[in-house]
Amino acid sequence: MIYTNNIFNFLTLFVSILIFLITTLITFAAHFLPSRNTDSEKSSPYECGFDPLNSARVPFSFRFFLVAILFLLFDLEIALLFPLPFSVFFHPIHTPLILTVGLIFEWVQGGLDWAE
């Protein structure tokens, strides 16, 4: 029993060191192997599809802003749902009910309609 435990510990250590060495080798290989050809396309900045040579004050649709804010709001509320099964003080049906009512309200008000 003691002998197999020592072998298991040795194999665990060996595999850990082997994984570390392989990862280090791949990291150094990725750093030294790529070609250093820089052209105008690779060295030019790219900002989410906007041309960086024009004005940075390009107006965009208020509808896009509204959908982005709604996404952040519902995303935050979904993130708050994760600890809900462990909650003792709050009944688990209240938060999904509030989320559903908010979603239905936005749907009825037309906040989720992209094209008018």
Curated annotation (Swiss-Prot):
Molecular functions (GO terms): NADH dehydrogenase (ubiquinone) activity
Enzyme class: translocase
Protein name from the UniProt record: NADH-ubiquinone oxidoreductase chain 3
Family per record: Belongs to the complex I subunit 3 family.
Organism of origin: Patiria pectinifera (Starfish)
Source organism superkingdom: Eukaryota
Physiological role: Core subunit of the mitochondrial membrane respiratory chain NADH dehydrogenase (Complex I) that is believed to belong to the minimal assembly required for catalysis. Complex I functions in the transfer of electrons from NADH to the respiratory chain. The immediate electron acceptor for the enzyme is believed to be ubiquinone.
Membrane-spanning residues: 10-30, 64-84, 88-108
